[in-house]
Structures are given as structure tokens and as C-alpha cells.
Amino acid sequence: LIGMTRVWALELGPHGITANAIGPGPIRTELFDRANPPDAPRTRAIIDAVPVRRIGTPDDVAHAASYLLDARSGFVTGQVLYVCGGMTVGVAGV
């Protein structure tokens, strides 16, 4: 997906079209909560592995998408916007 995003950015840029991707980290969704109950040791381990010490929310991802959809971000293309609480900065322990 990242490779396709970069290719699309190069191919579509001359037409005024930007192409970007969002790279989410652990996001608190119904599926996440079913697999990782709030009081489970694994959930605590996931939170401890995130530098900001919390699980992301759908709103965190939506905010990133909103930024990329805004006309003022028209000079941003071919990028991955990681919404991961800093997990991609280093090696996660999970």
C-alpha cells in the first residue's frame, strides 16, 4: 500500500491529485476491545509499548484523514501519516 501511495503521488500529482496513506497503531474499536479486554495483562502490555501510553481512538484516525482531505494539505503527497502514538519511532515490545 505504501508503494502504491508513492506511485500514485507521482502519477497523479501533475493532475493536482494527492495520494497519501494513514498508518494506524492500536486503535480502540469494538474488535480491539473484544480481543483485548481493558483489564487484561496483554492490553496493559500494548499500552505500555505505546510511547504516549494510551490506545488510539477512531477520532485520532479521523482527524488525520480530515487533515489529508483539507485543501490546505495540497502540498502533502506520497506520505504515510502514522497515527500510532509514537510506536513507529522505535521497536514496540508487543
Features from the language model and the residues they span:
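Short C-terminal tail/terminal secondary-structure segment
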Residues: 66, 77-94
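Short-chain dehydrogenase/reductase
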Residues: 5-6, 62-65, 69
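A short C-terminal helix-loop "cap" of Rossmann-like NAD(P)-dependent dehydrogenase/epimerase domains
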Residues: 34-50
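Conserved catalytic helix of short-chain dehydrogenase/reductases
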Residues: 1-11
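A conserved structural motif in NAD(P)-dependent oxidoreductases
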Residues: 50-61, 72
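Rossmann-like NAD(H)/NADP(H) cofactor-binding core
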Residues: 15, 20, 79
